[in-house]
Amino acid sequence: MIWMSVLAFMVSFIGCALLLRWARRSATSSYGYDKPQRFHMGEVPRLGGVPMYLGLAVSWGVGTWLSMRGDPSSLRMQLWVVVCLAAMLPAVVGGIIEDVSQRLSVRYRLLLTLLSAVLAVLLCGLTVPRLGWPWLEQALGPAMPWLGMGLAVLALTGLPHAFNIIDGYNGLAGMVATIICLALAHVALQVGDRTLAAMLVTLAAATCGFLVWNYPRGMMFAGDGGAYVWGLAIALASIALVQRNSAVSPWFPMLLLIYPVWETVFSIYRKLMRGMSPGMADALHFHQLIYRRMVRGVFDDDLARRMLRRNNRTSPYLWAFTLLTVVPALLFWSNTPVLVGFCLLFVVSYVVAYLAIVRFKLPGWMQNNG
């Protein structure tokens, strides 16, 4: 598992370095100045998904090959791991095309993530086998397997876009993905699932190889391709963890992922209430409000350095926000009622905090006075 992590990190790290060298000679991956989500100066390549996917492909591929030739590391990685990589490819390629051209519409990207989701469910046999409430599962009867497949497709389709939404500042989505991967890997080891643990740790390692260039210097962004790598791989691992291990509550990964999931749901609701298309970008996400209303100003004569330093100060707020869900999830990973309770608590806390920020109801010491 350690050698796989080192391999994933090095491939991702070196891949980012090579892409940065290439990007200096090309402006094809810049991010438009008219985008409402833009909070940086200069041209920054949005191709972090390429080296991260390559890091996964190399480490998972080599791990599967070694497992089929005697499994010296006792990882028990089978061919379905490589099939998962292949299933991810349509969405990741679509994200990378958008990162380079900025011409692939939201509709086509959504269709590509749906295609990846359907391929993963059909080829890997993924499904959500239970809801955590036996009485409801019994009431559903023969409809439960179909509902499980539908929920798996929904998770695999939606989570990539959820990570794309929260990918607004240096290190934000990358660190959230790393924290979630390590939490999932911890529980996978608790139940003896070394295969999933290895897959998740290598995803965290590939992400760290990218984060070296992303935080705090902001030299490369993950882009849509990177968000889709995180969303698809984490969704695949979450579903497989629940499916392969009956002791794990299906609400364990739900609580871990409640921040990006609820950010997406709330954003759709907010835009519909304002008469906007859910696919239209705006600058009213939770992390953007924190940037404007809570992160104190930075005094620097250079505008680019001032924006970069303030950008970097935003992400730790959301890392801490994520840890508030990760800690109870790790403590109660098999206790469905408690996990559901913490999910509801997060939703209420998020809405209260969002409204407080919007209405300038924050305590004075939390407000941006700079």
Question: What role is predicted for each listed range?
Answer:
Residues L19-P45, F266-L308:
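Cytosolic, membrane-interface loops and tails of multi-pass inner-membrane proteins
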Residues V106, G171, A304-N312:
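Internal alpha-helical transmembrane segments of multi-pass membrane proteins
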